[in-house]
Amino acid sequence: MTDPNGPKDIPEQSAEAAEPVVSKPYIMPDDPEPDAVELLAKEAAEARDKMLRTLAEMENLRKRTTREVADARIYGVTAFARDVLEIADNLQRALDAVPAEARANAEPGLKALIDGVELTERSLINALEKNGVKKFDPSGQKFDPNFQQAMYEVPDASVPAGTVVQVVQAGFMLGERVLRPALVGVSKGGAKAAPAAAANGESNSAA
C-alpha cells in the first residue's frame, strides 16, 4: 500500500530547458540601406534636373520655330520677288532706250507714256521694299564677290585695283541674303590696297 504522504516523483527536466538562453549579438550589414531623407533628396534633385532639361529643350524649340516662321515670312517671296525684278528691269530698259534729246522734245502723248513707265517702275521697286527687298549700288566700293558679279575690267589708275567703277545693273538684298548680285565693272591697273596687317607692320617699323 502506497503512502499518500510519501515523496512524489518529480519529472525530469529536458536538457534543452536546462540550457541557458543566450541572445545573439546584432551584426550591422556591410551595405546599409540609404537614409530615407537622402533618398528623397536624390530623387528630388533628379526630377529637378529633368525638368530643367525639358524647359531648356522647349525654349530651344520655341526659338527655332520663331526663327523658321520669320525666315518663311521673309524668304517665302524669293521667287516672286525675282519675277517682279525682271519686270522692273524691262521697264528700266525701255526708259534707257529713249534718248535724252527725244525726252526733252517729246510730244505730250509720248511724254505722258514715259512718265507712266517711270511711275510704274518706281511703284514696283517700292512694293519690293515693303516686302524686305532692298536695292544696293556698290559704286566706289571694293569688289566683293559675295554681293557683286564682275562683268569686265576697266583700266583706271586713279583708283585702287579691284574697285567697282561702273554698275551695269544694281543689286538687291532680301533680308540678309543676296536676291540678285550687282553686275559691275571693276578697275585694273591702279595700286592695290595694302593689307591691314602689312600696313600696321610698316607703321611700327617706321616708329
From Swiss-Prot:
Region (Disordered): 1-33
Keyword Glycosyltransferase in annotation: no
One GO BP: protein folding
Keyword annotations of the record: Chaperone, Cytoplasm, Stress response
Keyword Cytoplasm found: yes
Gene Ontology, cellular component aspect: cytoplasm
Localisation: Cytoplasm
GO molecular function: adenyl-nucleotide exchange factor activity; protein homodimerization activity; protein-folding chaperone binding; unfolded protein binding
PROSITE patterns hit by this protein: GRPE
Disulphide bonds in the chain: none
Superkingdom field: Bacteria
Homology family: Belongs to the GrpE family.
Record text on subunit structure and interactions: Homodimer.
HAMAP family: GrpE
Function: Participates actively in the response to hyperosmotic and heat shock by preventing the aggregation of stress-denatured proteins, in association with DnaK and GrpE. It is the nucleotide exchange factor for DnaK and may function as a thermosensor. Unfolded proteins bind initially to DnaJ; upon interaction with the DnaJ-bound protein, DnaK hydrolyzes its bound ATP, resulting in the formation of a stable complex. GrpE releases ADP from DnaK; ATP binding to DnaK triggers the release of the substrate protein, thus completing the reaction cycle.
Full protein name: Protein GrpE
Organism: Rhodopseudomonas palustris (strain BisA53)
Encoding gene per record: grpE
